Amino acid sequence: MFQDEAGFGRINKPKHCWCRKGVRPRVPCHHIRQYRYAYGAVDPVSGDGYFLILPYCNTVCMNIFLEHLSAAYPDDYIILVCDGAAWHKSGSLRVYPNIELMFIPPYTPEMNPIEQIWKELRARGFHNEVFQTLDKVVDRLCNTIRCLTRETIRSITGRSWILSCFN
């Protein structure tokens, strides 16, 4: 499985959108620095995805994610491919017996296909939106994640160089 975290919050960036010819769309903006973080792990072969929304990107939250991931797949041995974030390599990180961490080289997000899942979630639920509360951000994030099917995850993350390793 490939793992990563992404921040979703109340700061929005206007994106292109459709409108009638001759009409300039109005897109409100917020610059409120409140975030929640989606921790996720995806399997490009099966299309399995596991996500958890947590308040921070740190070792404590990564430990919570690993605990839940381990419990969700108790009979599987998971090779979890991560980037080199500090909390992935912390001395206080608890790695469970059914999980082994592997790391992609530094500064190579293109090697982590879950990055495209974050892009898809933002496109589906966050473009040109203003959220009045952080709870509304979390609600939208949860609903958008729930709409991801196995087929969608497979099609977004199933890169040929990954799939060829399992054929």
Labelled PLM ranges:
Residues 1-167:
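Short functional hotspots at interaction and active-site rims
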